[in-house]
Amino acid sequence: VTNTGNVTISGLVINDAQLDAAAVCPVTTLSPGASTTCTGTHTITQAEINAGTVNNSATAVGTAPGGGTTTSPPDTTTTPITASASLTIDKTAGTPSGNTAGSTIAYSFLVTNTGNVTLTGLQVSDAQLDGPESCPVTTLAPGASTTCTGVHTITQAEVDAGVVNNSATASAFPPAGPVVTSPPDTTTTPITASASLTIDKTAGTPSGNTAGSTIAYSFLVTNTGNVTISGLVINDAQLDAAAVCPVTTLSPGASTTCTGTHTITQAEINAGTVNNSATAVGTAPGGGTTTSPPDTTTTPITASASLTIDK
């Protein structure tokens, strides 16, 4: 502060509404031409950080010998504040509600404002969620966090793979500049595979009761596991040829009926029954083989013993 007049100024003070406390002046009386340097401190506000500048104006005020007040013209400083907008996301997967397609996984997303500016319009981007995420707040001050939630319905492809991989990011708008997006966070949730088949074998009525007669068999095969089974075949050593299956890939819960034929032998006629056992075999997504428990049919053959003599 400089006294640019021709009279002594006393009671010098600084008028600056943004100072934390009154400015400190080493002297408060100035002769004409004399100067002094006063000091003060301002604590930066979040609003100023969001704006990117601190604009501060001050005047000097003193009293002339006649008692009148003298005020300097104002002087203003503009101090730039570097904005740093950033977010993090910490994704957590809950326990799946089951291990079949249609089961669900609940996710939580802890989003934190790790920058120095207020962020608005918070959103979580996760393409696998069934619907929009739910965030209790969408405006975050620096250092603040919120936990958003969402649900994903498990697909058959994920059950077959044995895992649900899910990645998410958080994004929001800083006071100025482009949208800011967090690095992605990914969860890996294992899904327990359970591959199983059943077979229900049915024997038709024999075409006759002599060697060379035939029995038509049907095999109802059901995928009773939670993974897709492919390469389905029937293991039945007594069939004349490989069983025919209209489909060889079964989704969980799906069934197909395969068919095959057996030609009755003389030994079976002599025994009076045809005992026939079969299993269904398929391949699980991981490459392992799945075999059903065997199912057996017993088909009675009517014996007819007779002789003739021609003497």
Regions found by a protein language model. Name each.
Residues V1-K311:
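Exported/extracytosolic protein signature
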